[in-house]
């Protein structure tokens, strides 16, 4: 009987990709993490009653620096009074402002351009289309909301257990 249980445990073992493989694509990523926040991530965080900075620390453990581009801020301003609370959260002094040099660019395109040129970010979004586009860039982790908690995808030795 002892042999049968050992064989079963061997069958259940799943090979994981070593975290060193991840850093072949992105050696610039390390604590304190810089999290590039999207418009809908702020909205979903408010709907799920998750405090952004504390939720990121709970997910990743080390210190995190949430970053927001001027394109995302302008997108929140354009959405009108319905999103004024999200705009107030985005203007929090704990958020690092990233100035954009381009004019009139869609916020998702701005985020993709930024992560392609500087691979030191984790992208926080709940937008399926943007998540698909970020997955095409090697070495960029994703943060999203699932079951009223932040989750991280494609980060070696992930933060909080599920």
Positions of predicted regions on the chain:
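Nuclease catalytic cores that cleave nucleic-acid phosphodiester bonds
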Residues: 67-162
């Amino acid at each position: 009987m002892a042999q049968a249980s050992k064989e079963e445990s061997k069958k259940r073992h799943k090979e994981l990709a070593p975290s060193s493989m991840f850093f072949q694509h992105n050696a610039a990523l390390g604590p304190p993490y810089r999290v590039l926040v999207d418009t809908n991530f702020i909205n979903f965080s408010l709907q799920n009653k998750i405090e952004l900075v504390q939720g990121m620390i709970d997910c990743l453990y080390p210190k995190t620096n949430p970053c927001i581009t001027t394109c995302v801020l302008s997108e929140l301003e354009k959405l009108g009074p319905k999103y004024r609370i999200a705009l107030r959260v985005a203007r929090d002094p704990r958020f690092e402002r990233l100035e954009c040099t381009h004019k009139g660019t869609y916020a998702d395109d701005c985020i993709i351009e930024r992560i392609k040129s500087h691979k030191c970010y984790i992208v926080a979004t709940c937008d399926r289309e943007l998540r698909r586009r970020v997955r095409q860039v090697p070495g960029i982790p994703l943060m999203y909301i699932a079951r009223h908690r932040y989750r991280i995808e494609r980060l070696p030795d992930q933060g909080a257990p599920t």
